[in-house]
Amino acid sequence: MSVSYEDVVNAYALIQNHIINTESYYSNVLSEILGSKIIVKYENKQHTGSFKVRGALNKLLSLSKAEKQNGIIAMSAGNHSQGVAYSAKILGIKSTIVMPDNTPFDKIRKTSDLGADVIIHGETLNDAEKHVDSLVKKNNFTKIHPFNDKFIIAGQGTMALEFIEDHPDIDTLLVPVGGGGLIAGCSLIAKHLNKKIEVIGVETELFPSLYNVYNNTNFICGGSTLAEGIAVSNIGKIPLSIIKKNVKEVLKVSENSIEEAVSIFLLKDKVVSEGAGAAGLAAILENKDKFKNRNVGIFLCGGNIDSRVLSSILMRDLVRKGQIITLSIAMADKPGQLGAISKLCAEERVNILGVEHSRFALDLSVSSARLEITLETRNNEHAKNIIKKIELLGFSVIVKNTK
């Protein structure tokens, strides 16, 4: 079951009145950091915060009257659930979404708020899909697959249709890869509009399913990833047939790079990205020479990230930059020791965030104490300077939170 350029154009005609033609523009700040001309499609500003509504709408609009009346069902741990629920709501179709146990609560709540009946079932997406299949048989629902469906693929491809028509100078397109629906649709459009565009897939190193196909490797898929939206172990058969014709290569990126990319989007470009949405930027971070002086198009394809996770990313970024450090300081157990360090911190304009003073750890001598202190500094250089000055006071210092 193939997908054509005309399928994507027809999909756009169907859904364009229901979606946002999200903004895309050259990012000066990202380009200066990375040495490439970076053009970003900000699909995090789409309805439900991701591109998934495009494919979902196109699929639901293709259903027969009877299928719509019987209701639809989908499995998802991420944005597909919200895309389907939103589309069903505006089209007046009853929806049921099955989500695995590890789905972030924020996504469960948002899906429920959109009117879907949410069922939590199984540890993995495969477990959820098995339950979906049983409910399809029981209730005669229509299953809305997240990527292995020609209507879904055509809908996702409309994002590239907008992007490349707005920026015909793009010569490289980086696309996050989960099950393959997005990159199948986008690569199809890219190659139709400009055969010279290089389309490159990007996966987290924990789920390199398409990378394995392209490189004849057998890396195991699994693990806890920040990019749960692309944590898929197997590429769909329908998208894979399209991908092989249009995608040049696939890159896998580390979790650290994805985390850094999310942080850069927020702190430098002033936008919120989820892990999967930052995969393209992460690929450039790891391959600056490869993309130097190219006109690189990237999709910030989703901005649905748990606030606690985002907070943790920002705090960890401060640790990497040396702006927050935790020191373990050995000292004699006598009056004035803590005061000396507090005085030094005040003189050096260092903020004390937390203090723990221990006398009873068995690895200490009876006349010793240990101070664990968390400090806020200006940068790595400032942090190194305060450590040196503490040591000059006669204390032994160990830095606890390092890169």
Can you name each region flagged by the protein language model?
Residues 1-403:
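PLP-dependent amino-acid enzyme catalytic core
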